[in-house]
Amino acid sequence: MDWESPSNATCCAECPVRVTADIIEHKWTTLIVRELVSGKKRFSELERSLVSISPKVLSERLKELEAKRIVCRTVFPTVPPTTEYELTAIGKELETVIRAMQYFGTLLLKSAESLEQASK
């Protein structure tokens, strides 16, 4: 993989890392994508699984992800209306990013645990 130099990457709108960061940079966005990696979810399911997210913020993030073609929304003609969210084909590609973050987070947690034990 070719890496651009940081000076070019930060100012270039076509920088792949910047494009990805623009999608996942907002609070809760990465966790919403993580929840959708396993499949379709209703709004209420997402709300329950993302403890402490407000309905307003969840709605905003889902709209942003839909506008960026990461998430697809399907509304069913029921009373009350049922809405499901799922990752689009390109959205599903973010699973590798989420898995890399999970791996890195696990390393950090283990490292912090090791440092804590060593200081005792």
Residues covered by each model-derived region:
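Short, charged recognition helix plus adjacent turn
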Residues: S111-K120
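Basic, amphipathic "hinge/linker" alpha-helix immediately C-terminal to the N-terminal HTH DNA-binding motif
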Residues: P77-M101
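Short beta-strand "wing" residues that participate in macromolecule-binding interfaces
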Residues: C72-R73
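Glycine-centered, phosphate/nucleic-acid-interacting loop/turn motifs that mediate DNA/RNA or nucleotide
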Residues: R69
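Basic amphipathic alpha-helical segments that dock to polyanions
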Residues: L58, L62-L65
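Short, solvent-exposed amphipathic helices
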Residues: V19, E93-S111
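N-terminal intrinsically disordered/low-complexity leader segments
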Residues: M1-C12, K120
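N-terminal helix-turn-helix DNA-binding core of bacterial DNA-binding proteins
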Residues: C11-V57, E84, K92, L115
